[in-house]
């Protein structure tokens, strides 16, 4: 019995008859799967919806020299309006920046004082309190000395839980009435590496006294390159993890989490909190339940008054420091400040993303939950290219725009040799091969840099997709021209000369895409997929159209799954599929769905249908026959 799922079978029956050689013939926003290094950001697979989210997570310091074409492509893709399914890579020995706040409670016996601060004694004769020390005994009282300190853990892990465990092991608490050291909460960066982030915590003064519970404002800040501070995020929370306000829990871990913060992660030590406030209440002689609601960070009660029998030490850390408290012990590990300087190791980490061997790497194969439309090569070495080819062959719902690198390829012979070495895994309808590289001005630094043509294609793809992926992804008619390429830097453009012959025909025959000049305008001249067979799926726009159709049907099918294969349920199932087909009908010359009624399929709980499409043809080559005819005066009657 088959497992639940939606399967698609590619049956290519669109073989194109070759033309006689004597005749010269030559919508939602897309999601790009990207892997890159960056100065900061999460290490998990992350779905990026827009350029602001990208900047929040990974920063806007897009340094090509240190992070290469992969980061630049990802940033430019979202800036153009696209979306990302992204994974930031770090060195395996990188460390997570973190800081924890520790509450230290010490029981101390001191002489009792009156409201004016004068020492009190007990008269030996009358037993009454007095400020006179003559014939009297000092009255001693028990107070709790409170000191907040900071602690950071130095270890190789991206899991805040590991840091929490390490902190718990380093602190002791001996029960009520005893001295104790209590970790209260932990802050970490959202991913490993050197961190410039800081946190600041101060009392929430927006509520009137008496308050129901003490709440605090958490500000997340970051130091800029010029030394100034930027405020990134602000949250309100309670130390007490049991507080609910308007139906919402106000604990730090509920308020600051993966859905609410793009900057930090938090952990609280709930069991230590309980022991902390109960011991503080016991030593100071205050009501335990009220103590849990008071402002313990700044030692005030529900009326805003300083709590007696609790003293905050002058050595206690100032959590309200305007410059914030730094996250410490972050490290880039082997990447250092320049991952591209350790290129072999950098590419090892990139490949682990694309071959699924990284942590949670099987996410890349989840076609139901993790949509991918395109993958743009970023001058990757051969091993990474092979991994991406295998990925798109497995998924079948996304297209790989593969470059041929930036080494050599300066002559026709160079390219012919490179083409001869292409493996069969590259010869797929899910791969489009591009032969060009050139120089552009880095949009972030203004410096001249070398990129493969897939960078420019990535930037162009977003608008092209939005305006109709059914259109050919090449040519001046659809704006696939490159006015940002610096003159004289393109590696090679094919020509047709008496000496060289028709080089373009070689590119077409081998399904290699190239750019060339038309009246000074650098234009992407083809959009072949790399499959060897010459069919309608040899054209990239046709494959992209079918993939878009597949994704929409796949998204719809789970809504109807487990409904019955008869009656109204079957009618509704068919109507849902047909409504999707209707929305895509203008993109194809013809499209129809044919339902197959088969008892064996029914018994195995399978809904089977065939979707037949014919594709719209477009003009790639123009043939004009020039006929010279006699004028009427010379015509023979």
Predicted region positions:
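Long, low-complexity, polar/charged, intrinsically disordered or flexibly structured peripheral segments
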Residues: 272-358
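Long, contiguous regulatory modules within eukaryotic nuclear regulatory proteins
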Residues: 162-189, 194-196, 218
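Broad, structure-driven detector of short, well-ordered beta-strand segments within folded domains
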Residues: 169, 194-208, 235
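E2/UBC-UEV (E2-variant) core
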Residues: 237-269
């Amino acid at each position: 019995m088959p497992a639940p799922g939606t399967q698609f079978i590619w049956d290519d029956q669109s073989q194109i008859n070759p033309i006689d050689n004597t005749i010269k013939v030559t919508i939602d926003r897309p999601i790009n799967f990207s892997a890159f290094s960056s100065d900061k950001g999460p290490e998990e697979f992350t779905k990026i919806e827009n350029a602001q989210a990208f900047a929040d997570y990974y920063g806007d310091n897009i340094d090509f020299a240190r992070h290469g074409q992969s980061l630049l492509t990802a940033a430019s893709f979202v800036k153009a309006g696209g979306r990302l399914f992204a994974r930031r890579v770090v060195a395996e020995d990188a460390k997570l920046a973190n800081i924890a706040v520790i509450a230290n409670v010490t029981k101390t016996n001191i002489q009792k004082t009156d409201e004016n601060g004068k020492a009190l004694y007990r008269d030996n004769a009358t037993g009454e309190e007095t400020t006179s020390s003559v014939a009297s005994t000092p009255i001693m009282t028990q107070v709790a000395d409170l000191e907040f300190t900071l602690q950071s853990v130095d270890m190789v892990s991206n899991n805040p839980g590991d840091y929490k465990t390490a902190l718990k092991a380093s602190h002791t608490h001996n029960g009520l009435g005893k001295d104790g050291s209590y970790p209260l909460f932990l802050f970490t960066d959202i991913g490993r590496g050197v961190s410039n982030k800081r946190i600041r915590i101060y009392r929430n003064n927006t509520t009137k006294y008496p308050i129901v519970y003490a709440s605090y404002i958490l500000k997340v800040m970051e130091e800029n390159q010029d030394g100034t501070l930027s405020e990134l995020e602000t949250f309100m929370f309670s130390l007490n993890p049991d507080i609910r306000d308007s139906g919402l829990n106000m604990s730090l871990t509920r308020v600051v989490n993966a859905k609410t913060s793009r900057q930090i992660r938090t952990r609280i030590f709930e069991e230590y909190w309980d022991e902390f406030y109960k011991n503080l209440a016991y030593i100071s002689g205050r009501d335990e339940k009220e103590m849990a609601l008071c402002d313990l960070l700044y030692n005030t009660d529900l009326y805003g008054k300083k709590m007696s029998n609790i003293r905050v030490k002058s050595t206690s850390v100032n959590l309200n420091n305007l410059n914030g408290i730094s996250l410490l012990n972050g490290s880039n590990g082997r990447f250092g400040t320049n991952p591209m300087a350790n290129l072999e190791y950098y590419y090892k980490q990139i490949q682990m993303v694309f071959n699924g061997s990284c942590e949670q790497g099987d996410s890349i194969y989840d076609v139901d939950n993790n949509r991918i439309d395109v993958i743009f090569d970023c001058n990757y070495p051969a091993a990474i290219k092979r991994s991406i080819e295998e990925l798109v062959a497995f998924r079948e719902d996304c297209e790989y725009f593969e470059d041929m690198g930036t080494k050599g390829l300066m002559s026709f012979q160079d390219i012919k040799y490179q083409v001869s070495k292409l493996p069969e895994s590259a010869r797929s309808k899910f791969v489009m091969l591009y032969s060009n590289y050139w120089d552009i001005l880095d949009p972030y630094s203004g410096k001249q840099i070398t990129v493969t043509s897939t960078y420019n294609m990535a930037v162009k793809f977003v608008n092209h997709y939005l305006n109709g992926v059914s259109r050919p992804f090449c040519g001046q008619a659809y704006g696939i021209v490159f006015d940002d390429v610096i003159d004289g830097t393109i590696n090679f453009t094919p020509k047709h000369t008496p000496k060289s012959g028709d080089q373009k025909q070689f590119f077409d025959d081998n399904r290699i895409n190239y750019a060339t000049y038309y009246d000074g305008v650098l234009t992407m001249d083809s959009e072949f997929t790399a499959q060897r067979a010459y069919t309608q799926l040899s054209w990239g726009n046709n494959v992209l159209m079918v993939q878009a159709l597949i994704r929409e049907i796949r998204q719809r099918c789970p809504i109807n799954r487990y409904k019955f294969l008869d009656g109204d349920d079957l009618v509704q199932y068919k109507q849902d599929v047909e409504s999707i087909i209707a929305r895509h009908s203008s993109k194809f010359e013809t499209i129809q769905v044919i339902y197959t009624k088969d008892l064996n399929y029914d018994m195995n709980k399978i809904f089977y249908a065939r979707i037949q499409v014919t594709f719209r043809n477009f003009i790639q080559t123009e043939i004009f026959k020039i006929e010279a005819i006699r004028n009427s005066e010379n015509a023979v009657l």
